């Protein structure tokens, strides 16, 4: 191998004094130009080790070719990780907010097996115990799941809940000084496909957090710590509404049964 293009060996010269503490006695090294590639550096290191071997220095426990390979591979892995950490999603993705990804039909019952029933005149949902032939009163919902470019929570999934066969969607907004549950008509459902985090359309979103198999809580995305709930008693006059987690006499866990 010809190493003259990478270095020249000079014995006992004052210019190589800086290398005297790093090379075996009697050997000095002067780099003729700056290496510009990893290959040049590798050739230079291997050449130094072989020269040291030629002067009677054993390479047995010192730097070996496989050590150089490990060093180069580790360097490549470290460089890759740095690039990944420095990368960031484009501003357009960060501003996209919530994006709908899927939808399926479902029905909801509370922990006392009361079903949601639509009261058309009052435009409210009520929780009732249905038996036998009255089960057809049970409301069927279209549940839409959403994702965000940067996940807000790892244990919760944003969802929207619409009454099947209608333009009515559950929403949470303030009324009488407190968050309350409403049924709102959405004429253009395309508005719900992508929702900005700063938009008032966030009122249609709820964080579904699973607490068991098909058992979930539904927290308002607009008013954190406020959950969809039903009355603990079988009082059919009280609507499905919002409450805080620790509210007495309210049920906040629901079985969400998928139908397709």
Swiss-Prot record:
Domain of life where this protein originates: Eukaryota
UniProt-listed GO biological process terms: cellular response to lipopolysaccharide; cortisol secretion; cytokine-mediated signaling pathway; fever generation; immune response; macrophage chemotaxis; neutrophil activation; positive regulation of cell division
GO terms assigned for molecular function: cytokine activity; integrin binding
Compartment annotation: Cytoplasm, Cytosol; Secreted; Lysosome; Secreted, Extracellular exosome
Record bears the keyword Iron: no
Gene Ontology cellular-component terms listed: cytosol; extracellular space; lysosome
Note: IL1B production occurs in 2 steps, each being controlled by different stimuli. First, inflammatory signals, such as LPS, stimulate the synthesis and promote the accumulation of cytosolic stores of pro-IL1B (priming). Then additional signals are required for inflammasome assembly, leading to CASP1 activation, pro-IL1B processing and eventually secretion of the active cytokine. IL1B processing and secretion are temporarily associated.
Record note on quaternary structure: Monomer.
Entry protein name: Interleukin-1 beta
């Amino acid at each position: 191998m010809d190493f003259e293009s990478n270095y020249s060996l000079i014995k006992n010269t004052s210019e190589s004094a800086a290398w005297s503490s790093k090379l075996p006695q009697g050997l000095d090294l002067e780099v003729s130009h700056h290496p510009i590639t990893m290959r040049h550096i590798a050739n230079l290191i291997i050449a130094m080790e072989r020269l040291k071997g030629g002067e009677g220095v054993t390479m047995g426990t010192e730097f070996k070719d496989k050590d150089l390979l490990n060093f180069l591979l580790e360097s490549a892995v470290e460089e890759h990780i740095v690039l990944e950490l420095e990368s960031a999603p484009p501003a357009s993705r960060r501003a996209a907010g919530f994006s709908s990804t899927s939808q399926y039909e479902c029905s909801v019952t509370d922990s006392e097996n009361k079903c949601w029933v639509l009261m058309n005149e009052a435009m409210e949902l009520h929780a009732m115990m249905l038996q036998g032939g009255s089960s057809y009163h049970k409301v069927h919902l279209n549940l839409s799941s959403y994702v965000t470019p940067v996940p807000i929570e790892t244990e919760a999934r944003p969802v929207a809940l619409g009454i099947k066969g209608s333009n009515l969607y559950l929403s949470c907004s303030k009324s009488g000084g407190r968050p309350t549950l409403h049924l709102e008509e959405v004429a253009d459902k395309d508005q719900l496909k992508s929702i900005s985090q700063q938009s008032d359309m966030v009122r249609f979103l709820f964080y579904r957090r699973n607490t068991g198999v098909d058992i979930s809580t539904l927290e308002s995305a607009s008013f954190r710590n406020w959950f969809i709930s039903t009355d603990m008693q079988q009082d059919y006059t009280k609507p499905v509404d919002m409450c805080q987690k620790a509210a007495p006499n309210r049920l906040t866990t629901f079985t969400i049964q998928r139908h397709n």
